[in-house]
Amino acid sequence: MIKYLKIKKNLVHQTAIINWKRVSIGTGNIIGPYVVIGNHPQHPTKKANGNIIIGNNNNFNEFCNIHLPTNLTRKTIIGNNNYFMNSTTIDHDCFIENNVILSSNVILGGNIHIMNGAQLGIRTIVHQNQIIGSYSMLGINSMITKKSIIEPGYIFYGRPVKKIKKNLIGLKRNKIKTDSLIKEKKRFKLLFKMKKK
């Protein structure tokens, strides 16, 4: 019998571990079995410094791990309506926007920014300090290296990833028109410049 507790208008499994002193959370979230939110950052020298901020209506499936930030940004941020499958790892200082899907066993290094509507396939690995563009799709078992550029609106696949084609189905599903995609591409370029300084 799976037992969930209602805490702060969220459903939290009784086996989940949440560092409530360092975690701010909205409403309508589902936090599954053995999820850990607020563990120390996976960094050999930097200590935790700051908080985790979680929005509304996110689903964290079993064994997800979300780590505290360092003094780099002092925030690990998760927006709204995201879906994280089992055993995903979100390391320190990450920023995940809205409507993002992380499939099972996805691993995000530190200080990664995932833009709206991106989908990462099973066992995708992302190098630290990367940006994943809006409405992009990363195929199963993909590897995003330091040199990868994941533009909005495209499908990428491989180890390391290569651009395959435009994500037409994903764009249609999310009702993204050309004007909206142009705006997201401009935002991606701005974030990319800031991240790569």
Question: Language-model features: where?
Answer:
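Short metal-binding segments enriched for Cys and/or His
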Residues: 91
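Conserved CoA-thioester-binding segment of acyl-CoA-metabolizing enzymes
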Residues: 13-17, 32
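Glycine-rich hexapeptide-repeat left-handed beta-helix
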Residues: 1-8, 30-54, 62-65, 69, ...
